[in-house]
Amino acid sequence: MNQTMEELWESSHMSAGHAGYLESLYETYLSNPEELPEEWLVFFKNLPIQPNSNGEISHKTIISEFKNIPRNSVVVKDEVDERQGKVIRLIQAYRNRGHQEAKLDPLGMMDRNIIEDLNIEFHGLTQDDLDEEFYTDTFITGSAKTSLREIVDSLRKIYCGTIGVEYNYIMESNERRWLQKKFESKLEKYNFSKEDKLHIYERLNSAEGLAKYLAAKYPGMKRFGIDGAESLVPLIDAVIQDCGELGANQICFGMAHRGRLNLLVNVLGKLPEDLFSAFDEKGTIEGSNTGDVKYHLGFSSNINTSGGEVHVSLNSNPSHLEIVDPVVLGSVRARQDRLGDKKRKKVVPVLLHGDAAFSGQGVVMESLQMSQTRGFNVGGTIHIVVNNQIGFTTSNKNDSRSTDYSTDVAKMIQAPVIHVNGDDPEMVVNAVKIATKYRNKFNKDVVIDLFCYRRRGHNEADDPSATQPLMYKKIASHPTVLNQYQEKLIQEEFLTKKEATIIKTNYRKSLESGISVAKNLSKNPNDSLWFDWTSYLDVLWWPKVDTTFPKKKFTNLGSKISSVPNSFKLGIQATKIFEDRKKMNEGVLEINWGFAENMAYATLLSESFPIRITGQDVRRGTFSHRHACVFDKEDGQGFIPLSKIAQAHNTRFDIYDSLLSEEAVLGFEYGYSATWPTGLTIWEAQFGDFVNGAQVVIDQFIVSAQHKWERLSGLVLLLPHGYEGQGPEHSSARIERFLQLCASENIQVCVPSSPSQIFHLLRRQAIRKMRTPLVVISPKSLLRNPQATSSIKELVDGSFKCVIDDSVEEKAKITKIILCSGKVFYDLNEQKNIKQKHNIALIRIEQLYPFPYDDLQEVLSKYKNFEEIIWCQEEPYNQGAWFSHRHRIQRVLDRFNDKKQIKLVSRPAAAAPAVGMMKLHLQQQTQLVEDALE
């Protein structure tokens, strides 16, 4: 298919300025081709040769001859061609920089410099050229040739009106041309019917009407309204309708508090009476739940569109701005995976941002960076920046960011940005039409930058004029978008003042009656569009769960995960690992951690539980223990044995190495797990120390979502932990922080110390219907410790033990009990045997929370003669489990009524988790073990 010159020009990185360079290369090719780089030699050799020609001729002689020809009438044509080129450059300048002169700010206070590139004089054209006709192709005016005056007028209407677009940094030329055509072709202009215009008006009225009603009914109470950004309501309404028309059946929204109440009532269909009850605090909070403020709560409903019914959900969120972004994306990916939506057209994520947060919060960049990765791609996100040009009290651009626009961060993934003036609601809806179609066609992110303002303070009780006196003086006299649009429709004779009054009156009556004011709500919603969580509610943690597995099936699966295709060439390390796994499966070798973990996945997959694992380096494992994916040493192709098992049992096994992010990736996995409870969702930290890079996700979602929003999640966190001389940044998963956050059985914290324990722990998490996050303090050195192994029998016939007793038989001779968790057990046990401390029993507490009071009591009751009991931990005194668990252990001891007190052996209190010198570490560890045993 032939390309036009314009298409070639648009797709090329070359320009007229490179012509001399190309000429010199060509002359070299003709005279001394051996001096050329190979790629240029190939290029010139492949140039087409005219049939019956004399071949290639040096241009130097031709140029010399032309220089000697007298200038004549050709000069006129040269001048015309030159001016034609100038017009093309002018057109391109508007495509590149027209947005910089667009009328985007409703208040007209935005600094807008005059862009010289957009003046005809800058390109060597004059006023005398305005009425001369030039070729434009058909993108601009609808005709091949038109006057410069009309060209400029069209360019200014398209690129410098109340909408501005940035897209010329996009590398894919087909995307650029598509966007260019959407904006420039008159055939693509969206004309609004009377019905369309009145619908927009009604939506604007609902936005302003609810804000005024709440202001009158609840003066001074925080509402975080969208006064000044009322066009957001018709914008969101258009997003839902357009996505539905394009074939989506689910839309997941994420947004902060500003405007949330308005969208809940006017778009999603929350009953006004329910909102008023929240203001009046008529509701009750049951049990240990805390609830949350009304502008953090989620909601869902089904809305009818021309393309069918769409399930719309708004995620609950904290006040921590933008942290909901990856959570929503994870939820969308889970829905797509559940539906088998490989093209990612059925479920659409829509994220609403504030301008200050979008440019300021790092999780935005992390979330954007995930957009085209294999493990986190959701087919493109529609971003809507509610750009009220102020963040609380900060409005000076020199304070809030270092870029021209708050949306410039989106350019890192080449997302097109459509800036639009919120006081032009029709153009706002136009922006939506382009954005939704772009996302649907290219499966990539797109940004709508809604320029607006904040009519009131950060909250309604705040006076913003103290810090922005000029802005709020301007706002005080600025008519609302509803009033402006009303006048426009009256002038166009689509609306009368009487009709406008009736619309406003009817809306207020609906509010007062408490009935729904949203449009197009489904009266009989299709319940197949959401997941039924009923079987996962009110499940207790303490009943025993059968995690055994038939041995014959076990060894059959073990053989499959230890094999690769005959033609597959494993490397030396992987070959050794797979050979050892075959021996473990045959009972020749004891089972190590890596094999046990992989077998946990294999057995669950064979029972049709889907599994998803992400994190940095998870396919191999940071410490080379997992090797869930192996690579052919000759062609580099990967092979995942567990995927074959998943396919055979009609389920999924997804394991992805993540980008180097903790916060966004953990947020994504939380969202995934909170949407699809059927299987096992796992996030592994490279080292447990790095989990605090995602502390906001832990605090605001993982440990508290159930009690704030009644949202369940079965997410598993694998956090490598252990004191092995690697310094303060590679030793501690900060157990103390997780334990401090434990309350009301909100999470599980476990420290498995053997392969059989991790096998049963992972199986328990999937099989048991309780969907509570599981924090696994996983080992590092134990992955290869020959003492940390298990038998096949322990895996196929055993269970997860919250407390593991000492194997000592003569318990009556025990006078001292050491309680511990994790790796330190093996250090203690080794020295205990060397020193023949037969009077000491080592008891491991493998589940730190919920604390196994009864299990510990049962074990301790076997020791009738112990005189001393201590808690031994590797961590410093002020860290680890001591402060959170000494009273729990003591509570168990008090049941025996013998007044024994738990004592501690640990490292001294320290500001950092561990020392940075191996020599000092070994000294400390030796002393710790000696103190515990003596």
Task: List where the protein language model places each region.
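Thiamine diphosphate
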Residues: 2-10, 15, 49, 113, ...
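Conserved internal helical-beta-strand scaffold that buttresses enzyme catalytic cores
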Residues: 1-363, 368-399, 413-415, 441, ...
